[in-house]
Regions:
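Metallocofactor- and cofactor-centric catalytic cores in central/energy metabolism, strongly enriched
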Residues: 1-138, 152, 156, 160-165, ...
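Internal helical hairpin/lid segments
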Residues: 235-326
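Short, conserved secondary-structure transition motifs
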Residues: 176-183, 263-266
């Protein structure tokens, strides 16, 4: 398949691995006991790494830390409870992406709410939800707007369309979050040793490569934005390792075929019209992070489901036995969690990292 097979070429992969091996052999201070730690921020990268066994092909002196770049994985239990309360209303059709259906809150999951009679539907875009609202004028249709900057443009454009069409029965629960403040929080805590970052490709397609420069300058960590194919990731690792060995600290872009310095400016304009930063947002396992989430601007407040239904915020503590938060910041591996593959598995996903198709625990379970 054109533009896919080229990025999975075994001979090219072998060449990149040999170059990496040669570099690491000349760095005796990096050993399996004291490895070079690279964080892949995005869950999509995590799955590519495990699906193609890249972690087993790399020198033993390179180790991955799995980052918080999966929006379902960092979804607080209290936010699920808000969604379930709204979905249970008889006048509501609740629309969500499929990954969010099985995430558990104190009140259960949206999948369980559907089984109990709530009208909960899986959609593939917010425009699908808007069409449902147009076709069901006697119902209140609520879309669960979830995701990083990757999904924010489609949500923003949908709300612009709803406003233009004067749709009165369409609302959103806003759970969109931003990547740069999250990485600021992670690095400022200094709890985990990270030598370099594989930055997410899809988010960067929207925000561009420029926003990472502040992180690079402040924390003196190199970043390489990368795509999602095996050769993308191997080339990005080579670029990161080269920077570290040469004692450089830069933002480099391996994913130039998709990502540009300033990102998608039309998408950014739509986002800035519809959304504004919140003072603080809660993340599962990470707590409150300043300016890491968004809410609707004044011109779009009429579409806010939580305002319309007068929802009260929920604070729900995570299970103390679960180590989702530690996995998210790289303090432990999924297999170190006492629930992994026992109480928590894909058929009975107790933690959000096992629910999502991008979760590190799901990747470990499926490929290890």
């Amino acid at each position: 398949m054109q533009f896919v097979d080229e990025f999975r070429d075994p001979e090219l992969a072998k060449s990149l691995l040999q170059r990496l091996q040669k570099i690491m052999e000349n760095q005796p201070h990096f050993t399996p006991e004291n490895p070079l730690y690279l964080m892949e921020v995005c869950g999509g990268h995590t799955h590519t790494i495990f699906k193609f066994g890249l972690d087993r092909l790399l020198p033993k002196s390179i180790e991955f830390i799995h980052g918080p770049g999966c929006p379902v994985c960092v979804l607080p239990m209290g936010r699920i409870d808000v969604c379930i309360e709204i979905a249970r209303r008889p006048e509501v059709i609740f629309c969500t992406f499929g990954d969010a259906m099985r995430v558990r809150g104190r009140l259960g999951s949206l999948l369980e709410a559907k089984a109990q009679g709530a009208d909960v539907r899986i959609v593939y875009s917010p425009l699908d939800a808007l069409n449902i609202a147009s076709n069901n004028p006697d119902k209140k249709v609520v879309f669960f707007s979830l995701g990083f900057e990757t999904t924010m443009p489609s949500a923003a454009i949908t709300l612009q369309q709803a406003k233009k069409q004067q749709v009165k029965n369409f609302f959103v629960v806003c759970q969109n979050i931003t990547i740069i403040p999250t990485l600021h929080s992670l690095l400022s805590q200094g709890q985990v040793k990270i030598d370099g970052f594989l930055a997410p490709g899809h988010v960067s397609m929207v925000i561009g490569s420029e926003p990472y420069q502040e992180l690079c300058d402040t924390y003196h960590k190199p970043f390489v934005i990368t795509g999602f194919e095996p050769l993308d990731i191997l080339q990005a690792i080579l670029m990161l390792v080269t920077q570290i060995v040469e004692k450089r600290c830069e933002v480099e872009n391996q994913y130039k075929r998709i990502v540009h310095q300033h990102g998608n400016e039309l998408a950014q304009q739509a986002i800035s019209e519809v959304f504004r930063l919140k003072a603080s947002s809660e993340w599962r396992g990470l707590g409150e992070i300043a300016e890491s989430g968004v809410e609707l601007t004044d011109d779009y407040q009429c579409f806010d489901a939580e305002v319309h239904f007068a929802c009260q915020p929920h604070q729900v503590a995570d299970d103390p036995d679960s180590r989702c938060g530690d996995v998210l910041i790289g303090k432990c591996k999924p297999a170190d969690c006492p629930l992994f593959a026992k109480k928590c598995n894909p058929d009975n996903a107790y933690g959000a990292l096992m629910v999502s198709s991008e979760g590190a625990c799901a990747a470990y379970y499926q490929y290890r």
